[in-house]
């Protein structure tokens, strides 16, 4: 009798900053009991490693060394969510060698597990192009800026809405126009516009797609 290996069931969720993809990914992971990796945190962790050592953010060799020694299980979302770290992360994220190192680590995470949920900017296109289900979550810049603004206020920090909106638009342009792994939906991705959709509505839409894909995966 022939033996065969069942491919891991991977849910790939992509989208621009503050689109709600992370919240949706966590909701899906919790519902299905799947391990979750926020790949954006990996870039933030590299940036923090450089900042902690007082190293320059524009040195690709140093940033790549930090990426290669990164422990995915040691990342602290609360610490890495700081605005300054996010700004620093956007600088190291454009470095091809850093992206290659982190993509390899992210891919290993997904392929080493029976099932997983990964969210980021290039999961369905680069990290896990063979993912069982691909979602691309988007929302208007204004809606995303309002969400980010509310998040900052909820943490007890001060924020300027116009500044956050300008930063998001700048990040969108950088993400979509970079030569290595630009932000774009995979050809077979399901689009979810969360501009006027609650997280629960987005989850229910995603759940319907995932349940169908799971049934096919299990045969």
UniProtKB/Swiss-Prot annotation:
Reactions the enzyme catalyzes: CMP + ATP = CDP + ADP; dCMP + ATP = dCDP + ADP
GO cellular component entries: cytoplasm
Keyword annotations: ATP-binding, Cytoplasm, Kinase, Nucleotide-binding, Transferase
Residues annotated for ATP binding in this entry: 15-23
Keyword Lipid metabolism in annotation: no
Pfam families: Cytidylate_kin
Domain of life of the native organism: Bacteria
Keyword ATP-binding (UniProt): yes
Cellular localisation: Cytoplasm
EC number: 2.7.4.25
Single biological process term from Gene Ontology: pyrimidine nucleotide metabolic process
Single GO MF annotation: ATP binding
Family: Belongs to the cytidylate kinase family. Type 1 subfamily.
The protein's name: Cytidylate kinase
Organism of this sequence: Brucella abortus (strain 2308)
């Amino acid at each position: 009798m022939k033996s065969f290996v069942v491919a891991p069931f991977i849910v790939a969720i992509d989208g621009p900053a503050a689109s709600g993809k992370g919240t949706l990914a966590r909701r899906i992971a919790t519902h299905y009991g799947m391990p979750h990796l926020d790949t954006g945190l990996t870039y933030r962790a590299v940036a923090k490693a450089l900042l902690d050592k007082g190293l320059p953010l524009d040195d690709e060799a140093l940033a790549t060394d930090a990426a290669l020694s990164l422990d995915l299980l040691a990342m602290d979302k609360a610490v890495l969510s700081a605005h300054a770290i996010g700004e620093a992360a956007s600088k190291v994220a454009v470095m091809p060698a850093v992206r290659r190192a982190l993509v390899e680590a992210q891919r290993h995470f997904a392929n080493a597990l029976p099932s997983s949920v990964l969210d980021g900017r290039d999961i369905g296109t680069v990290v896990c192009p063979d993912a069982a289900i691909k979602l691309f979550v988007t929302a208007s810049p204004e809606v995303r800026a309002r969400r980010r603004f509310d998040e900052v206020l909820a943490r007890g920090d001060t924020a300027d809405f116009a500044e956050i909106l300008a930063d998001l638009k700048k990040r969108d342009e950088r993400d979509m126009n970079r030569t290595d792994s630009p932000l774009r939906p995979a050809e077979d991705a399901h689009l979810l516009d969360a501009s006027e959709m609650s997280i629960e509505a987005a989850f229910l839409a995603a759940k319907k797609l995932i349940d169908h894909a799971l049934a096919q995966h299990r045969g």
